[in-house]
Amino acid sequence: MSLFGSANFGLPRLKPLPSKRSHVVSVLDIGSTKVVCMIGRLTPRAESQILPGRTHSIEVIGIGHQKSRGVKNGVIADLDAVESVVRLAVDAAERMAGLTIDSLIVNVSAGRLQSDVYTATIDLGGQEVEANDLKKVLAAAGHQSLRTDRAILHSLPTGFSLDGERGIRDPLAMFGDVLGVDMHVLTAERPALKNLELCVNRAHLSVEGMVATPYASGLAALVDDEVELGCAAIDMGGGTTTISVFAEGKLVHADAVGLGGHHVTTDLARGLSTRIEDAERLKVVHGSALPNSADERDIISVPPIGEDDRDQPTHVPRALVSRIVRARIEETLELIRDRIQRSGFSPIVGKRIVLTGGASQLTGLPEAARRILARNVRIGRPLGVSGLPAAAKGPAFSTAVGLMIYPQVADLETHAAGSGMFSTLGGNSRFARMGQWLKESF
């Protein structure tokens, strides 16, 4: 059955994880440069003291990854090609895990991700805040976000207010005259999500849930204090670069730009008249986001385009490669800087930026990012999982690992049911347990 019913504004939320037994989760990261399938076992443990909902440890028991085909800038461009790659990646993960899967959690980079904050208030008349009051104010905020052309990926209450006093995390049982809520809603265009689901269905698999790429990569790459105090995670992929801003343990903003590492590769291929695969090798081996005086003296050979082995390679200074790389990297970083500034969340981000994704491994990128973004920058690798092979411990696998973390925090969200009313799924926090009661009682 499709996730997209005719009356559904939001995607169905994942079922709560079992609290007393282990559970197997399978995920699929469909990117412009690679497709990754991971299978993991989630085992209950003591809940994190800082990050809400982190109740399970994760062990990767199967992984498969393939070079991507049929995806351009995060958008499905060739259904047959994507289906073939998905089959190969899933098969490799199943063989390693020794089991067969039938559903997956999938990432979303396409669909023009849009992040909005909606505010709503209701009158309490000086009475105590009850569970039904929370339901009403969440529904009032949620109704503002409903659009027929877009599907809700994530909807998180980022904070409540009482009588204008903001920053209240859990107002249940408190007294006041006016109860308010700020709701962060992340949406994507429905056709892009339908095409993504279609690719997975054609591989005889179903989509269990969809997670925005910036949310997933942030879950994997940020440490507790960064998520609590405020930080931005920049996931530099092959075809897209995504931005996620976290504060007080929650995702408060997300964005995406259609530039990534593959654009650097194509710039090199055009500028040096060489094949894409040779340009990729030149980028990895010789490319740098920083100028170096020695680059003018170092000469490198560039294989020409063509099938004639007798064609002689051209020789260029390494500085030319770096100049081409640097121009595109600086353009991307400047665009990220402007997006963060325009979002209004720049003060929340403060001085903390974490770079992750495959393109973040380019030589000199952290230094270039510090200069252009004017913030402290570190490279973020996937955290919080065991069993990852050495080849999958780098920034390129942050999104896939974040997809495995997501089921633990999915119950922090509210979502639009078929009727358009917002409901809350259960979990282990006080607010989530209240949500489970709401779900069962109304």
Curated annotation (Swiss-Prot):
It is a peripheral membrane protein. InterPro entries: ATPase_NBD (IPR043129), Cell_div_FtsA (IPR020823), FtsA/MreB (IPR050696), SHS2_FtsA (IPR003494). GO terms for biological process: FtsZ-dependent cytokinesis. Signal peptide: none annotated. Self-interacts. Interacts with FtsZ. Cell division protein that is involved in the assembly of the Z ring. May serve as a membrane anchor for the Z ring. Belongs to the FtsA/MreB family. This is Cell division protein FtsA. It comes from Rhizobium meliloti (strain 1021) (Ensifer meliloti). The lineage of its organism: Bacteria, Pseudomonadati, Pseudomonadota, Alphaproteobacteria, Hyphomicrobiales.
